[in-house]
């Protein structure tokens, strides 16, 4: 998998923008219809996938970049269908393995190894399972993960040459001192320079049960701060919680229960949160994969274009060390 193109500079901005009067196209559904494909490890394809997979792909003719998505703690990959569909409708192929189903989850090292098997399967196994005239560009793959899957995504990026990494409220344990293995937050700086976007939640650090689902010291801020060699963006969805990117009512009973009762959730509809997260992901990858920076730079310049409130928006361009910042007021 090839490295990213060079990042583009951004001007330094501080303060709070005026309220946007219109949304951006990345926050609404894209031009492509989508097709969902389910693969089991018993699939007749050669080689079969090492883990069960959901693939959501644009249904149209073309060549599309790939996103490897890693689910959150003990959640079903089926619980993210709205986000997958939104992203795929903008011209990306989402590959989402079911790494495990158990509660408690396996060791983080075992989870990482399972994700690595799927990453290694992509170049040989993905294309033959796509619709006719739909081609996957596996030379430029982004890895994205939610919750504990975010930790796995960053750990996988230390091992493989992904084109970009995206963390959706990533979590590395219950605290900095009780982190998951491999303990990547023990590093002062991650040993990669690929572009990064981290999206955190304002309520992820608020406990609902025994502990917060995205506790301070092991959450999105820690991941962002360690990407010192990367062009990197950070967004915080102020009024939403750790599970608010999931479908409203996940079909898997376990995921439904975890989604509704385990973490502190926001009081508003999840739909704007999902559209915001999906839109940021699309805008980020359009910028760094295709050189189409307009939407991503507009969000950084004026976060009120997003369908939800975003605080602590920050972008650091590694090539120039210029910073775009919107501080919380």
UniProtKB/Swiss-Prot annotation:
Protein's UniProt keywords contain Heme: no
GO biological process: chlorophyll catabolic process
The protein's Enzyme Commission number: 3.1.1.14
Keyword Transit peptide assigned: yes
SUPFAM superfamilies to which the protein is assigned, alphabetical: alpha/beta-Hydrolases
Residue positions of motif GXSXG: 145-149
Induction: Low constitutive expression during fruit development and no marked increase towards the later stages of maturation. Strongly induced after 24 hours of exogenous ethylene treatment and increased further up to 7 days. Gibberellin-A3 (GA3) and the cytokinin N6-benzyladenine (BA) inhibit this induction by ethylene.
Chief subcellular location: plastid
Single GO term (MF): chlorophyllase activity
Compartments in which it is found: Plastid, Chloroplast
pH dependence per the UniProt record: Optimum pH is 7.5. Active from pH 5.0 to 9.0.
Reaction catalyzed: a chlorophyll + H2O = a chlorophyllide + phytol + H(+)
GO CC terms of this entry: chloroplast
Annotated organelle transit peptide span: 1-21
Catalytic residue list: 147, 169, 242
Keywords for the protein's UniProt record, in alphabetical order: Chlorophyll catabolism, Chloroplast, Hydrolase, Plastid, Transit peptide
Protein name: Chlorophyllase-1, chloroplastic
Gene source species: Citrus sinensis (Sweet orange)
């Amino acid at each position: 998998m090839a490295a990213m193109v060079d990042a583009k500079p951004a001007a330094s901005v501080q303060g709070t923008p005026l309220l946007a009067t219109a949304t951006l196209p990345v926050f609404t559904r894209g031009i492509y219809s989508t097709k969902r494909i389910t693969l089991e490890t018993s699939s007749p394809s050669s080689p079969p996938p090492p883990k069960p997979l959901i693939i959501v792909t644009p249904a149209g003719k073309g060549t599309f970049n790939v996103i490897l998505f890693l689910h959150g703690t003990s959640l079903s990959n089926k619980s993210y269908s709205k986000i997958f569909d939104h992203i795929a409708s903008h011209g990306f192929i989402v590959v989402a393995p079911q790494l495990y189903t158990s509660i408690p989850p396996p060791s983080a090292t075992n989870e990482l190894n399972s994700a690595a098997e799927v990453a290694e399967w992509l170049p040989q196994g993905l294309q033959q399972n796509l619709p006719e005239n739909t081609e996957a560009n596996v030379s430029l793959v982004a890895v994205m993960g939610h919750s504990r899957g975010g930790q796995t995504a960053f750990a996988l990026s230390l091992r493989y040459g992904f084109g970009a990494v995206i963390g959706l409220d990533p979590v590395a344990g219950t605290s900095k001192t009780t982190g998951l293995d491999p303990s990547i937050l023990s590093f002062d700086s991650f040993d990669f320079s690929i572009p990064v976007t981290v999206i955190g939640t304002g309520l992820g650090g608020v406990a609902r049960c025994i502990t917060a689902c995205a506790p301070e010291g092991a959450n999105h801020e820690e991941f962002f701060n360690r990407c010192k060699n990367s062009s990197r963006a950070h967004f915080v969805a102020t009024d939403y919680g750790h599970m608010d990117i999931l479908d409203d009512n996940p079909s898997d009973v376990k995921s439904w229960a975890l989604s509704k009762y385990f973490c502190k959730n926001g009081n508003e509809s999840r739909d704007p949160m999902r559209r915001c997260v999906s839109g940021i992901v699309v805008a980020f990858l359009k910028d760094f994969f295709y050189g189409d920076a307009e939407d991503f730079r507009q969000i950084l310049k004026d976060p009120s274009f997003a369908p939800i409130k975003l605080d602590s928006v920050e972008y650091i361009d590694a090539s120039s060390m210029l910073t775009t910042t919107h501080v919380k007021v």
